[in-house]
Amino acid sequence: MSRVYNFSAGPAVLPEEVLNEAAAEMLDYRGTGMSVMEMSHRSKSYETIIEDAESDLRDLLHIPENYKVLFLQGGGSTQFAMVPMNLMKNRVADYIITGQWAKKAHKEASIYGKANAIASSADKTFSYIPDCSDLPVSEDADYVYICENNTIYGTKFWTLPNT
């Protein structure tokens, strides 16, 4: 088999070693006699997977113990609703619209309250990150939303706005 390179915005090419290990463990995960897909989410084996994943994330991202790590189903689109549902206490949030993902998040947030577009690069098809040095942040905004890395348009915040 000839391996291909994948330059799409979504999943990337994985090393063959990783794929081979995953294939082997598909039938027998670390000597348990079953695949992870067959395990009870209450089993000790599965709990160990989650505990190790949380520990690795905390180490990699320097997440302090006073923060919770949540493993949630759904992708980015699900988060567009979860963010305002959980953070929009005053029913006001500010959005910096820099691409399709931020645009979708802004639209979803408007269902739950007032979602202000305080900066945007829609005028030039999201080909740049707008100047965020003097943002008109709403006094009553519960949060300011950005999509840091716009995979569709190839733009990225290199420094986060001071909000």
For the regions a language model picked out, list residue spans one by one:
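Active-site-proximal loop->helix
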Residues: 86, 104-113
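Active-site phosphate-binding strand-loop segment of PLP-dependent enzymes
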Residues: 10, 109, 121-163
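Conserved PLP-anchoring active-site segment centered on the Schiff-base-forming lysine
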Residues: 88-103
